[in-house]
């Protein structure tokens, strides 16, 4: 019996593939558990259409991420914080703080999860920050932590 896999099935195939399996295996295991559906040309067209839509969505997401990254890399971003003598910051600069400050200056909608900090920044100075945007776009940007006047 020909089936179209709705999920990845170990030792059988990946989602969307058309496979020939025994009738009993299809009727008693794959179809009742929602792993596959019986093959029809209409179902195959629907799955191909779904894959095409998903591919376009990922491409759009990647393009959008590349635009955002290009905008972020244009300059060194400044984060102003309250600091004491010797450049020690009151509190710490976290990924959320960085995302918020850059959003204010650039007008971009940024998510704190896109910025990777090994540990919170506790001193004034310049830092390189890894940015990991949706669509697999990664790079580093520069930020400068300055004393708030």
From Swiss-Prot:
List the GO molecular function terms. rRNA binding; structural constituent of ribosome
Residue ranges of the TM segments: none
Would the keyword Ribosomal protein be found if you checked this record's keyword annotation?
yes
Q: Where is the signal peptide?
A: none
Q: Is the RNA-binding keyword given for this protein?
A: yes
Assigned keywords, A-Z: Ribonucleoprotein, Ribosomal protein, RNA-binding, rRNA-binding
Q: Which GO biological process annotations does it have?
A: translation
Q: Which domain of life is it from?
A: Bacteria
Q: Which GO terms describe its cellular component?
A: cytosolic large ribosomal subunit
**InterPro entries xref list:** Ribosomal_bL9, Ribosomal_bL9/RNase_H1_N, Ribosomal_bL9_bac/chp, Ribosomal_bL9_C, Ribosomal_bL9_C_sf, Ribosomal_bL9_N, Ribosomal_bL9_N_sf
PROSITE patterns to which the protein is assigned, alphabetical: RIBOSOMAL_L9
* Gene3D superfamilies according to UniProt: Ribosomal protein L9, C-terminal domain (3.10.430.100), Ribosomal protein L9, N-terminal domain (3.40.5.10)
Task: Write out the similarity annotation.
Answer: Belongs to the bacterial ribosomal protein bL9 family.
Known role: Binds to the 23S rRNA.
Q: What is this protein called?
A: Large ribosomal subunit protein bL9
């Amino acid at each position: 019996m020909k089936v179209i896999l709705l999920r990845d099935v170990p030792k059988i195939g990946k989602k969307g593939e058309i496979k020939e399996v025994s009738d009993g295996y299809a009727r008693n295991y794959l179809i009742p558990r929602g792993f596959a559906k019986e093959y029809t040309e209409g179902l195959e067209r629907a799955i191909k259409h779904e894959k095409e839509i998903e591919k376009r969505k990922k491409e759009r997401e990647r393009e959008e991420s590349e635009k955002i990254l290009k905008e972020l890399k244009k300059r060194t971003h400044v984060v102003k914080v309250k600091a004491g003598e010797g450049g020690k910051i009151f509190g710490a600069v976290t990924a959320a703080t960085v995302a918020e400050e850059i959003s204010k200056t650039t007008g971009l909608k940024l998510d704190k999860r896109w910025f990777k900090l090994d540990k919170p920044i506790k001193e004034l100075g310049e830092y390189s920050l890894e940015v990991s945007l949706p669509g697999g776009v990664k790079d580093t940007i520069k930020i400068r932590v300055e004393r708030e006047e």
